């Protein structure tokens, strides 16, 4: 039975079959292992292929990469592990090659994390023998995650967080014995490199319904170990952080995917007014910020960290500690700052053009994400109450900001340059210094209000402003006025 499942899984993606055929033709002893065998037996399609090699794995990976005109990525030279990345439509495909972790394949399987990941199929056999020394098939059928050995977490504590992720991916449960082992070795997570923790945490955040996995991680004690700033299990801060992620996913999860089904809550609430931006937001959130981490996934991190005291997040200390990239740190900071700005605005009336301009001047494209994050945070804090005046104002402000970003950038966010700093120095005889930038900023704010539309109008406006500065009066900026165009 499993032979057919393996064959069907390989045939589902011709490129996968091509790689297996090439490896088999080289005459090396190689095995399909780990998640590959697990997913094949479950009938779960993925773009990954895991191969264990008796011999030089990195050299073989290089040959496959050359044959496929693909990227070759060395992962661990000390353990002889490399990845081949093929970027095609629907991809990318990841083909991982690793030298056996022990003297033979059975010992290699006993050195793995969970029994459902400790099965292998020999490519030389051809696909006739399923190697399952730890009882992975039994646990796969039962839907449980069981540690291969009692010292599995001592050997690599990150396997605890991986168990949280696999639980979310597969809908399995950890056995009571495995949960007890995990709790016993939580303290050892501090020994794991922060880069590895970050990568595993991002994979948890990438799950649909990540909040459920985060809540479980909190109950297990993992979240407090990784983010001690959130406090221990059941603390208000941790619960608020997880609720914010849950609210974000409930409100916008379908918008960030290809799923065309909206929840009843979305159809019934005033959030429906924002649905016209759904396709644009789907593209926006699919953008990769760094190392395969999409904007949507990093926004979930911002939702999680946004519950922390402001002093911890304004400088990105936590994201920096997790070894996030510079771009991700700036995004998290800006999205949280944007969310807090909207929440501080409260139930005020419509935003004027200058307020919108300054918002995006300060926050750039993360202002889009932060506006939507503010809705999730407010909804989480108000226990899903969408009838308040503040909620209606938040939706209205968010609609104005999305309209400005997606439909009126050249008018409200980045108006055309009418004068340069050189023009101010030469024509208006402004002295070099901070005043040049201040005047150009004032000019842009006048433009977004529709007060200035041509270079000649810009010169006249600045002349009046300079005279006003000299006399102690300034032209009215009309910051809350309506755009004239």
Which residues are covered by each model-predicted region?
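Catalytic cores of the polymerase beta-like nucleotidyltransferase superfamily
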Residues: 1-485
């Amino acid at each position: 039975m499993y032979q057919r499942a393996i064959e069907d899984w390989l045939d589902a993606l011709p490129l996968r079959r091509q790689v297996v055929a090439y490896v088999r033709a080289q005459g090396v002893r190689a095995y399909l292992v780990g998640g590959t065998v697990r997913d094949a037996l479950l009938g779960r399609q993925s773009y990954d292929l895991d191969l264990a090699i008796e011999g030089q794995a990195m050299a073989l990976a290089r040959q496959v990469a050359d044959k496929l005109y693909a990227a070759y990525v060395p992962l661990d030279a000390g353990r002889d592990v490399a990845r081949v990345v093929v970027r095609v439509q629907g991809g990318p495909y990841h083909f991982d090659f690793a030298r056996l972790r022990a003297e033979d394949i059975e010992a290699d399987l006993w050195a793995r994390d969970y029994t459902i990941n400790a099965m292998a199929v020999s490519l030389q056999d051809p696909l006739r023998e399923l190697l399952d020394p730890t009882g992975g098939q039994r646990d796969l059928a039962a839907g449980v995650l069981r540690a291969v050995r009692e010292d599995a977490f001592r050997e690599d504590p990150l396997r605890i967080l991986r168990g949280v992720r696999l639980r979310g991916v597969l809908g399995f449960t950890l056995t009571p014995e495995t949960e007890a082992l995990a709790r016993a070795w939580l303290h050892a997570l501090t020994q794991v490199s922060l880069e590895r923790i970050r990568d595993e945490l991002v994979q948890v955040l990438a799950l649909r319904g990540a909040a459920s996995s985060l809540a479980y991680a909190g109950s297990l004690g993992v979240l407090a170990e990784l983010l001690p700033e959130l406090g221990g299990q059941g603390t208000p801060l941790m619960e608020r952080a997880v609720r914010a992620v849950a609210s974000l996913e409930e409100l916008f999860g379908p918008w960030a995917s290809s799923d065309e089904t909206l929840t009843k809550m979305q159809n019934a609430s005033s959030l429906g007014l924002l649905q016209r931006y759904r396709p644009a937001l789907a593209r926006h959130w699919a953008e990769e910020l760094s190392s395969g981490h999409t904007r949507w996934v990093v926004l979930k991190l911002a939702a999680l960290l946004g519950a922390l005291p402001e002093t911890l997040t304004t400088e990105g200390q936590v994201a920096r500690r997790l070894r996030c990239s510079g771009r991700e740190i700036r995004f998290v900071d800006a999205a949280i700052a944007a969310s807090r700005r909207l929440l501080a605005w409260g139930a005020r009336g419509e935003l004027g053009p200058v307020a919108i301009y300054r918002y995006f001047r300060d926050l750039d494209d993360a202002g889009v994400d932060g506006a939507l994050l503010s809705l999730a945070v407010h909804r989480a804090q108000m226990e899903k109450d969408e009838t308040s005046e503040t909620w209606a104002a938040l939706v209205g402000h968010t609609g104005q900001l999305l309209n400005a970003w997606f439909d009126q950038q050249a008018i409200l966010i980045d108006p055309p340059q009418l004068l340069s700093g050189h023009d101010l120095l030469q024509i208006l005889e402004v002295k070099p210094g901070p005043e040049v930038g201040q005047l150009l900023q004032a000019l842009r704010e006048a433009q977004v209000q529709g007060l200035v539309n041509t270079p000649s109008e810009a010169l006249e406006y600045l002349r009046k402003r300079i005279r006003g500065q000299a006399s102690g009066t300034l032209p009215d900026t009309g910051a809350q006025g309506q755009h004239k165009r």
